[in-house]
Amino acid sequence: MFFDNNKILITGNGTFAQAMITQLLSYEEIKEVRVFSRNENKQWETSKRFNDRRLNMIIGDIRNYGALLSAIRGVDYVIHSGALKHVAVCERQPVEAIATNVIGSMNVMLASISTNVKKLVCLSTDKSANASTCYGATKYLMERLAIGPRPQGRSPPP
């Protein structure tokens, strides 16, 4: 299996993260699943729900590069799902949306590069296409950072 004997870190602890945790822990060969999220209550509930020694709940914020770097050290794969996701919240608090969805995502990318993770998967949204909201715009910028610069006239990889 793809994740055999590997350690995976998931940022965020929303609906997608819960589904990923369920799937990953179903593989007996998974070494460790780390969940890095700032929601203390959700972290506690998740640890009780799964009650699996391979699950490591880490309270932290992707906007804090040092804490994130510490959490990522030693993992093989990173699944980045941490974000402010409510359109109305991002509209009312654009600075927070930028700090989390753009700067925080950049921190995830930089920490993943500096610790030589095998693969980083960044989750986005359909709202980033022709973005008309602050949320959509921040996710579009996250996508651009993930793709990185490319020579003019070249298409991004498939």
Question: Where on the chain are the PLM-derived regions?
Answer:
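Conserved residues in the N-terminal Rossmann fold of short-chain dehydrogenase/reductase
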Residues: 37, 58-59, 99
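Hydrophobic/small residue at the entry helix of a nucleotide-binding pocket
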Residues: 16-17
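Conserved Rossmann-fold NAD(P)-dependent oxidoreductase catalytic core, especially the SDR/UDP-sugar
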Residues: 77-80, 84-143, 148, 157
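Helix N-cap at the beta1-alpha1 junction of Rossmann-like dinucleotide-binding domains, i.e.
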Residues: 40-41
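Conserved N-terminal Rossmann-fold NAD(P)-binding element of oxidoreductases
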Residues: 9-12
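Conserved Rossmann-fold cofactor-binding substructure of NAD(P)-dependent oxidoreductases
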Residues: 56-77
